[in-house]
Amino acid sequence: MPLHKSAEKRLRQSERRNARNRARKKELKTLIKNMQKLIEARAAKSEVESAYRSAVQKLDRLGVKSYIHANKASRKKSQLTRLFNGYAEAE
Protein backbone atom coordinates (compact mmCIF):
# COMPACT_ATOMS: atom_id res chain seq x y z
CA MET A 1 0.00 0.00 0.00
CA PRO A 2 1.16 3.55 -0.67
CA LEU A 3 2.83 5.35 2.19
CA HIS A 4 2.55 8.89 0.86
CA LYS A 5 -0.47 10.97 -0.04
CA SER A 6 0.77 11.49 -3.60
CA ALA A 7 1.29 7.75 -4.02
CA GLU A 8 -2.31 7.15 -2.90
CA LYS A 9 -3.50 9.60 -5.52
CA ARG A 10 -1.39 7.94 -8.22
CA LEU A 11 -2.89 4.58 -7.25
CA ARG A 12 -6.43 5.96 -7.57
CA GLN A 13 -5.59 7.51 -10.93
CA SER A 14 -4.01 4.35 -12.28
CA GLU A 15 -7.03 2.28 -11.22
CA ARG A 16 -9.38 4.64 -13.05
CA ARG A 17 -7.19 4.65 -16.15
CA ASN A 18 -6.84 0.88 -16.05
CA ALA A 19 -10.62 0.46 -15.92
CA ARG A 20 -11.06 2.91 -18.81
CA ASN A 21 -8.45 1.13 -20.92
CA ARG A 22 -9.99 -2.27 -20.24
CA ALA A 23 -13.42 -0.96 -21.24
CA ARG A 24 -12.08 0.39 -24.52
CA LYS A 25 -10.30 -2.84 -25.36
CA LYS A 26 -13.39 -4.87 -24.46
CA GLU A 27 -15.51 -2.70 -26.74
CA LEU A 28 -13.06 -3.33 -29.58
CA LYS A 29 -13.15 -7.09 -29.01
CA THR A 30 -16.95 -6.98 -29.01
CA LEU A 31 -17.03 -5.14 -32.34
CA ILE A 32 -14.67 -7.67 -33.91
CA LYS A 33 -16.67 -10.62 -32.55
CA ASN A 34 -19.92 -9.11 -33.84
CA MET A 35 -18.45 -8.86 -37.33
CA GLN A 36 -17.25 -12.46 -37.19
CA LYS A 37 -20.66 -13.66 -35.98
CA LEU A 38 -22.38 -11.84 -38.85
CA ILE A 39 -20.05 -13.51 -41.34
CA GLU A 40 -20.65 -16.95 -39.80
CA ALA A 41 -24.41 -16.34 -39.90
CA ARG A 42 -24.13 -15.38 -43.59
CA ALA A 43 -25.78 -12.00 -42.92
CA ALA A 44 -26.41 -9.39 -45.60
CA LYS A 45 -23.33 -7.72 -47.01
CA SER A 46 -24.52 -4.29 -45.85
CA GLU A 47 -24.72 -5.47 -42.23
CA VAL A 48 -21.25 -7.00 -42.38
CA GLU A 49 -19.86 -3.87 -44.03
CA SER A 50 -21.35 -1.71 -41.28
CA ALA A 51 -19.78 -3.92 -38.59
CA TYR A 52 -16.47 -3.88 -40.48
CA ARG A 53 -16.40 -0.09 -40.71
CA SER A 54 -17.17 0.40 -37.03
CA ALA A 55 -14.46 -2.09 -36.02
CA VAL A 56 -11.86 -0.45 -38.28
CA GLN A 57 -12.84 2.99 -37.03
CA LYS A 58 -12.40 1.85 -33.42
CA LEU A 59 -9.04 0.25 -34.25
CA ASP A 60 -7.85 3.48 -35.84
CA ARG A 61 -8.89 5.53 -32.84
CA LEU A 62 -7.29 3.20 -30.29
CA GLY A 63 -4.10 2.91 -32.33
CA VAL A 64 -3.67 6.66 -32.74
CA LYS A 65 -4.32 7.32 -29.06
CA SER A 66 -1.92 4.51 -28.02
CA TYR A 67 -4.47 2.39 -26.19
CA ILE A 68 -3.13 -0.43 -28.33
CA HIS A 69 0.14 -0.43 -30.27
CA ALA A 70 -0.12 1.12 -33.73
CA ASN A 71 1.30 -2.01 -35.36
CA LYS A 72 -1.27 -4.20 -33.61
CA ALA A 73 -4.04 -1.92 -34.84
CA SER A 74 -2.67 -2.14 -38.37
CA ARG A 75 -2.38 -5.92 -38.18
CA LYS A 76 -5.95 -6.32 -36.89
CA LYS A 77 -7.27 -3.99 -39.61
CA SER A 78 -5.49 -6.08 -42.22
CA GLN A 79 -6.97 -9.30 -40.81
CA LEU A 80 -10.47 -7.83 -40.76
CA THR A 81 -10.08 -6.50 -44.30
CA ARG A 82 -9.04 -9.93 -45.57
CA LEU A 83 -11.98 -11.50 -43.76
CA PHE A 84 -14.42 -8.94 -45.16
CA ASN A 85 -13.06 -9.14 -48.72
CA GLY A 86 -13.29 -12.93 -48.67
CA TYR A 87 -16.89 -12.69 -47.51
CA ALA A 88 -17.74 -10.03 -50.11
CA GLU A 89 -16.33 -12.18 -52.94
CA ALA A 90 -18.22 -15.26 -51.77
CA GLU A 91 -21.47 -13.31 -51.41
UniProtKB/Swiss-Prot annotation:
Region Disordered, as annotated, extends over 1-25
Keyword rRNA-binding present in the record's keywords: the answer is yes
Alphabetized InterPro entries for the sequence: Ribosomal_bS20, Ribosomal_bS20_sf
Report the GO terms under cellular component.
Answer: cytosol; small ribosomal subunit
Question: Where are stretches of biased composition, namely Basic and acidic residues?
Answer: 1-18
SUPFAM superfamilies the UniProt entry points to = Ribosomal protein S20
Role played: Binds directly to 16S ribosomal RNA.
Quote the protein name from its UniProt record.
Small ribosomal subunit protein bS20
**What broad taxonomic lineage does this protein's source fall under?**
Bacteria, Pseudomonadati, Chlorobiota, Chlorobiia, Chlorobiales
